[in-house]
Amino acid sequence: MYGRTRVSAALAASRPGEELVLKGWVRTVRVGKDVTFLAINDGSCMTSLQVVVEPALPNYQDVCRIGTGSAVAVRGILRESPAAGQKYELAAEELEIIGPADDSYPLQKKRHSFEYLRTIAHLRPRTNTFGAVFRVRSSLAQAVHRFFAERGFLYVHTPIITANDCEGAGELFRVTTLDMARPPLAAGEVDYSGDFFAQATGLTVSGQLEGELFAQAFSDIYTFGPTFRAENSNTARHAAEFWMIEPELAFADLMADAALAEDFLKFLCRHVLDNCGEDMAFFNEQIDKGLLERVRAVADSSFAVMEYTEAITHLKKAKVPFAFPVEWGLDLQSEHERYITEKVVGGPVFLVNYPKDIKAFYMRQNDDGKTVAAMDLLVPKVGEIIGGSQREERLDLLLERMAQMGINEDGLWWYLDSRRWGSCPHAGFGLGFERLLMYLTGMENIRDVIPFPRTPRHAEF
């Protein structure tokens, strides 16, 4: 049987009587007295197409013994279904069992816990929940590119292997060809001069610094790729490998940055509502009641702006026993962020102008000498979902800040060059793709929105 029709296309058809070839996997089998029903799914949509197999089929007895998970090809006639809840069914005229699956197949017809499904991550895309997750993930990734392409942004592929730690937190995964059982030493430290790159290198924690360089040549750019953090955090929100979206705008200040972030998040919310309806309805029904209402509210609302200092005032007045202290100069925790967005504002809010001592070296210093032009976008139920800043374009102040933080100029000479010649105000932000997916699907663990999660002590598959 050559060619095939996707299940999604067959279900959307309006031409009963048409002959179709369907190829996919058996989700369920019901053997009746005079007929057998197979539910076939090929991943193109949530819904399976029912295939009706009658005893006249030459290999009918083989079909009756077919196992859940088997790969099949079916040629048949599409017809209106008399059963409630389904528009069409396929009356089989020929059925080929391409790849059988026996009773040892782990995904039998029952509900499996997410914890168990993580142990068989190579098979979980075949379930309803994870089929929906990864269809939305794919559609959302395409929407990211479309948003920036429609606005004239250049897509930049920044390096995976790097010699710099953009965030300065020392959370790099080291990349080396040295024999670490007997590493060469110099003054008591590993000597990387004989290594592949002749210096210490690691996996990138962010493409921002390289993105800034391209923004000062192409004006508006974005990166979208994998990033890595050797952070030993075993939480539902942390992974060692994840994807980041990082736009950068030349000739822009903090509020222009915030305006782009608002447009971007609203665009993505509308995209999943308009283009992923079946999967989003599933999440709303099975995973997170009220999800659709919350996503629509973000898409339709105007985002507020609040100073960090004002947020601290609200938190200090709150009649809530926070687990973490609230003081000016301390970073906000998720409980604080959620209180601000849910109780004080009642919707999305940008917190702006944070104390400089809790932010990165590259953020532009404000005139008060105490704060930097940083912003975090907070949304209900999650807290921070986007973080960004205006970058420090003044070479003298950037050098001064690097010295205060003990950051070696020599390793960032190329970054500093961008401030020596033709420097201009610029700004950008970062959005963790998996955090976004968690927000838009209601999935509560980052391990469940990435195909093969990388977390402490786990790098299977």
Swiss-Prot record:
Broad class of where this protein is predominantly found: cytoplasm
Pfam families in the record: tRNA-synt_2, tRNA_anti-codon
GO biological process: asparaginyl-tRNA aminoacylation
Top-rank taxon: Bacteria
SUPFAM superfamilies xref list: Class II aaRS and biotin synthetases (SSF55681), Nucleic acid-binding proteins (SSF50249)
The keyword ATP-binding appears for this protein: yes
Keywords associated with the record: Aminoacyl-tRNA synthetase, ATP-binding, Cytoplasm, Ligase, Nucleotide-binding, Protein biosynthesis
Compartment annotation: Cytoplasm
One GO MF term attached to the UniProt entry: ATP binding
A cellular-component GO term for this protein: cytoplasm
Key word Transferase present: no
Reactions it catalyzes: tRNA(Asn) + L-asparagine + ATP = L-asparaginyl-tRNA(Asn) + AMP + diphosphate + H(+)
EC number: 6.1.1.22
Family as reported in the entry's similarity comment: Belongs to the class-II aminoacyl-tRNA synthetase family.
Subunit: Homodimer.
Record's protein name: Asparagine--tRNA ligase
